[in-house]
């Protein structure tokens, strides 16, 4: 009888200890740190995308902070990030072409491209950050994002697959695909 009572008490206290360590506040998220595919750096932290998830590494205190849909981002599966030193904000592009701008730990959503019904192929090929703007080279043309105002400034539907763009000497250059060694040039007027 004494052994049975000891076993019951031991079991009771074991379950009590396990219950004390159980997370009752909700889900715990484990993000992958493998297969890093995008890294951007600010003055005080490094932004990293690994397997579609975003985290930051604090340079001063070696801290790691995770960002995901459950704690402030507006979508899942990040495909690309770009940091704008002028606006001190991070442009986040998701696989479905949804866009967030992260500034001071707060994400502002720009769903224009992902929710547009007039654009069929919404693939974002690359991003150029210049001044306070981000130029998104897409399967249909160029989308200009004003990162300071957190808004879509312009959309240029060129019916061309623009893989990248560059700004030099007051002009914006865009290579044409599939024609090699041909490019489209336009006058660069940011305002």
Model-found features: residue ranges?
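Short coil-to-beta transitions that initiate beta-strands within beta-rich domains
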Residues: 21-42, 67-86, 111-130, 154-170
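Beta-propeller domains
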Residues: 49-69
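A generic tandem-repeat structural signature
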Residues: 81-148
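Conserved beta-propeller blade signature
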Residues: 45-48, 55, 89-92, 133-136, ...
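Loop/turn residues immediately N-terminal
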Residues: 52-55, 95-99, 140-143, 171, ...
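Bacterial Sec-dependent N-terminal signal peptides
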Residues: 1-26
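Short loop/turn segments that connect beta-strands within beta-propeller blades
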Residues: 58-62, 103-106, 146-150, 187-190
